[in-house]
Structures are given as C-alpha cells and as structure tokens.
UniProtKB/Swiss-Prot annotation:
Designated name of the protein: Lactose-binding lectin l-2
UniProt-listed SMART domains: CLECT (SM00034)
GO biological process entries: defense response to Gram-negative bacterium; induction of bacterial agglutination
Signal peptide, first to last residue: 1-24
Oligomer and partners: Homodimer; disulfide-linked.
Tissues/organs with expression: Skin; contained within club cells which are a component of the epidermis in combination with epithelial cells and mucus cells (at protein level).
Record function comment: Involved in host defense at the body surface. Causes agglutination and suppresses the growth of the Gram-negative bacterium E.coli K12. Possesses calcium-independent hemagglutinating activity.
Domain C-type lectin: 41-161
Keywords: Antibiotic, Antimicrobial, Disulfide bond, Hemagglutinin, Lectin, Secreted, Signal
CC per GO annotation: extracellular region
A GO term for molecular function: carbohydrate binding
Origin organism lineage: Eukaryota, Metazoa, Chordata, Craniata, Vertebrata
UniProt xrefs under Pfam families: Lectin_C
Amino acid sequence: MVSFKLPAFLCVAVLSSMALVSHGAVLGLCEGACPEGWVEHKNRCYLHVAEKKTWLDAELNCLHHGGNLASEHSEDEHQFLKDLHKGSDDPFWIGLSAVHEGRSWLWSDGTSASAEGDFSMWNPGEPNDAGGKEDCVHDNYGGQKHWNDIKCDLLFPSICVLRMVE
C-alpha cells in the first residue's frame, strides 16, 4: 500500500469540497497546519461554529468538514473548548450523546464515555435524563460550567474537531 500526505492547502480544498466524509476518511491524508478558520491544539484542529443548530445538525455540519463534534478526554481539552467558545457563558454542543442503541454515553467519534475511569465533567446531579428525553450533551452549563444532558432538538453553537496526523 502506498502512503502519502497532502500539503495543507490541498487538504483544505479536499475537505471543503466533500459533502459528507465517513469517519476519518480524509484526515489521514492531511499534514501541517489546520484549515483556514480552524485552531490547532495538541495535534487536532478545532472550529467554533457560532450558528445555533440541533445536536444532529451540528454533528452533520462537522462531518461535512471532515470531523465530528468535539470530544473531551481531559481537563485540558475541556478548558480549551470553553476558551475557544469565545469567552461566552452560553452552552455549546459537544459530541457526547446516548442516541444510539443501548443508550450508553458515546462520543460521536466512536470513543466511549461510560467506562469506569473515563474522563467526565458532569455538573452535579447530571446526567439526569429529565423527562426521559435528554440524550445529547452541551458544555459550559450551570454554575460550574460543565456538562449537562439535554434534549437533542434544542439549538446551540458547537465546536468541531479534526484529528491531524503527525
């Protein structure tokens, strides 16, 4: 198998011309700087999307750009996303949901959030699945500005992530 990487300017062209990208299909081809408008942090590129969307529409928007809604696997990532959210106190979508069969918490990039020892940043008393209809998660909520489970059809800004290859 032949292995190659596209320079950053071609990577941007490829990602921006794709309607939907299967998980990670193009990311392995990209090297160097993040696409224009994205911010690099620890070998990942992040895009703050100010337009308010439902959780599903936010995820589809991230897929359109070749990524997923952002996942948080450390305190550092959690703080970085909050800082990237333009210093706003408003909540924003992250890639955590229980919308799939089995209803355990999974990140939209396929990584688990339910196993013992996994990083979590739930507000006290969360997740509470109020009314049995809270299957998606937004960050920067409540007094502590952490995670909250909420209805997926509400509208919030979001943050997308692309994983880069070294």
